[in-house]
Amino acid sequence: MEREGSGGSGGSAGLLQQILSLKVVPRVGNGTLCPNSTSLCSFPEMWYGVFLWALVSSLFFHVPAGLLALFTLRHHKYGRFMSVSILLMGIVGPITAGILTSAAIAGVYRAAGKEMIPFEALTLGTGQTFCVLVVSFLRILATL
């Protein structure tokens, strides 16, 4: 029995639908033994789910901040480059540190033999971004 989105003629449309519907990692050939089809059971599924939400939530905060910096500092000689650094930190931060922390979270879940529902991945990924924002704000506040 072939699962929807696992290949064939409509495979790419089913794969895209599966990724966009919070079923984060496409299951090709039903290689996992999850009792629930919506839960994330394997390490790559959990890691990718948490990492993706950390990246998206980081961009959600850094893109408006970068655009605001670009708009307000557009006439400054060197200040206009601050917006580029804000945007880069919104991408580079989750890619470097987010990969490691998401792998640690997924490793703990996997070692405990626990499944992760997509809402937990959303909470843990956005929680990482929230912690980064709090630490960044407190660092700036300490310099004033």
From Swiss-Prot:
Q: Which cysteine residues pair off into disulfide bonds?
A: none
Q: What's an example GO cellular component term for this entry?
A: endoplasmic reticulum membrane
Q: Which residues lie on this side of the membrane: Lumenal?
A: 1-50, 107-116
**Could you tell me the membrane topology recorded for this protein?**
Multi-pass membrane protein
Chain segments annotated as transmembrane: 51-71, 86-106, 117-137
Top-level taxon of origin:
Eukaryota
Its GO biological process annotations read: endoplasmic reticulum tubular network organization; nuclear envelope organization; nuclear pore complex assembly
| Role | Acts as a regulator of endoplasmic reticulum (ER) and nuclear envelope (NE) morphogenesis. Affects the ratio between tubular ER and ER sheets by promoting sheet formation at the expense of tubules. Influences NE expansion, nuclear pore complex formation and proper localization of inner nuclear membrane proteins.
PANTHER family in the cross-refs: SD17342P, TRANSMEMBRANE PROTEIN 170A
What is the protein name for this chain?
Transmembrane protein 170A
Organism per entry = Homo sapiens
Gene of this entry: TMEM170A
